[in-house]
Amino acid sequence: MSILLDSPVDALRQYVSFPSVSADQSFADGVSGAREFACSRLKELGFEVDLIPTPIHPIILATRGDPSWPRLVIYGHYDVQPPDPLDLWTTDPFDAVERDGRLYGRGAADNKGPQIVHMSALARVFRDNPDYPLHITYLIEGEEEIGSPSFRGFLGEHKQKLQGDLLLVSDTGSPGADQLVVTTGLRGLSAMEVKIFGPKQDLHSGVHGGALLNPLQALMQ
């Protein structure tokens, strides 16, 4: 718990140093390193930590406290976006640097920084009151940046463990550093295949335009 108490910024530097790019198998060691780092921090906080296997990257499912207490569920993800294009970075994307009071590195904001904030806050709560009456389920996945393909199945299998009175999602944003917001909803992803059928042969727009329905018009409708 000491690094979360003594130097949350250093904890974030360490977390960022793992290149946990889920979309590229060449970063597999970085993904596992970030996962192990998060598990270690949660164990330091007194959580019981389980790794739930998935076809791609395991999900961290950690719990702490008496199940009869009010229940809080916290969500985050340990994977990050690829750092490309590298020539737009002025420093190593996985070697976080501080400039003008901000820490720059891939994943510092999305989503490792918010997790360290939550863990550091919990470390202070548990230091002052080890038996704080709150049951916490901490969920950290490793596939968010590739669309969370394993997440729906995980939710179905573990929905009883994920019951809570409050859900805290550490993957939102703010209009500015001096503006605190409460985000109550997020857009999801939707993948679909659309088939549009038109004339069986090419037709010149200068001759047939307007007289026949253009497939592009149907697509726009």
Spans of model-derived segments:
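Acidic/His- and Gly-rich active-site-bordering loop/insert found
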Residues: 1-108, 125-134
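Fold-level recognition of mixed alpha/beta catalytic cores in primary-metabolism enzymes, strongest
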Residues: 100-103, 108-221
